[in-house]
UniProtKB/Swiss-Prot annotation:
Entries under Gene3D superfamilies matching the protein: YcgL domain
A Pfam family per the record: YcgL
HAMAP family in the cross-refs: UPF0745
Lineage, highest ranks first: Bacteria, Pseudomonadati, Pseudomonadota, Gammaproteobacteria, Enterobacterales
Protein name (database record): Protein YcgL
Domain of life where this protein originates: Bacteria
């Protein structure tokens, strides 16, 4: 069987590898190189659990990040070698409903 070598295309755009947490729902860790967690603090890795590869992504602005700001991700990767994306805060549907009907949600005011 003949071995084929595919040349790497050099690009000035930054790439990142995104991992999903095995312990925390909707928590993602962005690193610059696949399986390189050397810059991530040990305590964070312990709480994150076994990283599960989610995707590789160019950070050139062509694709939008869902719950993270592109510039913050790029800055964190450059400065600390990783970016941790936490889940959005849970929606308080009761509070939203009460404010939409004009009721004060503070227990002290009831």
């Amino acid at each position: 069987m003949r071995q084929v070598t595919i040349p790497l295309i050099q690009s000035k755009s930054m790439f990142c590898v995104i991992y999903r947490s095995s312990k925390r729902d909707q928590t993602y860790l962005y690193v610059e190189k696949k399986d390189d967690f050397s810059q991530v603090p040990e305590a964070l890795m312990k709480g994150f659990g076994q990283p599960q590869l989610a995707m590789m992504l160019p950070l050139d602005g062509r694709k939008k990040l869902v719950n993270a700001e592109l510039e913050k991700v790029k800055q964190a990767l450059s400065e600390q070698g990783y970016y941790l994306q936490l889940p959005p805060p849970p929606e308080d549907l009761l509070k939203q409903h009460l404010s939409s009907v004009g009721q004060n949600t503070s227990p002290a005011d009831r």
